[in-house]
């Protein structure tokens, strides 16, 4: 399966048969290279990926400044140190799951709930980790 198919079929999927979908998603190498993305995923800057990787290496580096994606600021909320970063911005937010080689991004807006986004992103991330990726 191609990386684009993972984005199209597993991240941009119909969530729990509700007819709702993530706003955008991507699979990005930990080096910042884009492996696959939805058409409307923000253009992420190298320094934004560096800051995300730094947060995974040592939590609480993003909390004071916020998480930036494509210049948009998200308030960092509870995550799982070294594994998941979650951010909130207005009625939407972001979930980022780290695997061995990649970062899985899911961005959502209402009516998608934070827990639904987390489930979609983390399920794919856990699968990729099981596959050694």
Curated annotation (Swiss-Prot):
Keyword Cell division included in the entry's annotation = no
- Domain of life of the organism in this record? Eukaryota
Expression sites (tissue/organ): Expressed in pollen (at protein and mRNA level).
| Any GO MF annotation of the entry | actin monomer binding
Q: Which Gene3D superfamilies match?
A: Dynein light chain 2a, cytoplasmic
Disulfide connectivity? 95-117
Would the keyword Thylakoid turn up in this protein's UniProt record?
Answer: no
**Assigned GO CC terms:** cell cortex; cytoskeleton
Q: Name one Pfam family in it.
A: Profilin
SMART domains in alphabetical order: PROF (SM00392)
Major localization listed first in the record, in broad terms: cytoplasm
Read off the CDD domains from this record: PROF
Question: What keyword terms does UniProt attach to this protein?
Answer: Actin-binding, Allergen, Cytoplasm, Cytoskeleton, Disulfide bond
Localisation:
Cytoplasm, Cytoskeleton
PANTHER family recorded: PROFILIN, PROFILIN-5
Function (record text): Binds to actin and affects the structure of the cytoskeleton. At high concentrations, profilin prevents the polymerization of actin, whereas it enhances it at low concentrations.
The UniProt family comment states: Belongs to the profilin family.
How the protein assembles, per its UniProt entry? Answer: Occurs in many kinds of cells as a complex with monomeric actin in a 1:1 ratio.
Q: What is this protein called?
A: Profilin Sal k 4.0201
What species is this protein from?
Kali turgidum (Prickly saltwort)
Q: What is the lineage of its organism?
A: Eukaryota, Viridiplantae, Streptophyta, Embryophyta, Tracheophyta
């Amino acid at each position: 399966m191609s990386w684009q198919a993972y984005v199209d079929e597993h991240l941009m999927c119909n969530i729990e048969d509700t007819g709702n979908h993530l706003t955008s998603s991507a699979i990005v190498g930990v080096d910042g290279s884009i492996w696959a993305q939805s058409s409307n995923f923000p253009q992420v800057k190298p320094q934004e990926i560096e800051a995300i990787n730094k947060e995974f290496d040592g939590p609480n580096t993003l909390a004071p400044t916020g998480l930036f994606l494509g210049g948009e600021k998200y308030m960092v909320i509870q995550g799982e140190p070294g594994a998941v970063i979650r951010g909130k911005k207005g009625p939407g937010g972001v979930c980022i799951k780290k695997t061995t080689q990649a970062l899985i991004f899911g961005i959502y807006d209402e009516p998608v709930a934070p827990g639904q986004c987390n489930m979609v992103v983390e399920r794919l991330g856990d699968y990729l980790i099981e596959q050694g990726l």
